[in-house]
């Protein structure tokens, strides 16, 4: 089953990019003390479908005690639904991520040379420019730690960068490959160049490259509550499931 393969891939990748994988009673702690500002690399992945919200909060407090945030990752959508309301009521941010696979041609054609693969230096510069513009007030240290995170994906998922336009990128995205699957991630367009079709060109270039190399499925994760999922549908992606993330910032601070 496609969704099961994607869940398996996500689990292996999550463990492949962190400093430490530590079993907990109701899941697995994914820890990267060397990059404490990168929430994505410091979380508790819940694996017990019977675990309740109070128990999981206590476990996250223990597992992530040295960090300024708390994060739960839940691949089981049914469990995510059950946890969403009680966790939201106690101040947790609830993020439902749609799993979308490319299963048809895009609705609109994009010029063949509008987007293409670029070298790591170009991709890194484009992502850094996008991240600095985000409304969360990321400090430069967080931008640097996110760049270090990208290097981990280079190793664990043979990550590559795609951009549009190629010479002076307005949009950059990343392509991960493992186990015959491909994931498009970190899609970002600088504010001054939005609405010009660069994101479509970059994403389609990455998706086409993955498909040409035999990857199946080609998929991405996107926030169910935000508009991009509608745009991804126009690029030929369809929803097949969802995963959940829960985030709490007890100490406040900038979003990495």
Which residues does each PLM region occupy?
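Conserved beta-hairpin
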Residues: 21-25, 82-93, 155-173
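Acyl-donor-binding surface of acyltransferase catalytic domains
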Residues: 49-126, 244-248
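Conserved acetyl-CoA-binding loop-helix of GNAT-fold acetyltransferases
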Residues: 53-61, 186-191, 195-212, 234
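Conserved GNAT acetyl-CoA-binding A-motif
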Residues: 65-76, 210-223
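N-terminal charged segments
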Residues: 1-67, 79-80, 155
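Conserved beta-strand in the GNAT
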Residues: 25-32, 95-99, 168-177, 181-188, ...
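Flexible, substrate/cofactor-facing loop regions flanked by secondary structure
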Residues: 112-182
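Conserved active-site alpha-helix within GNAT-family acetyltransferase domains
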Residues: 79-93, 200, 224-242
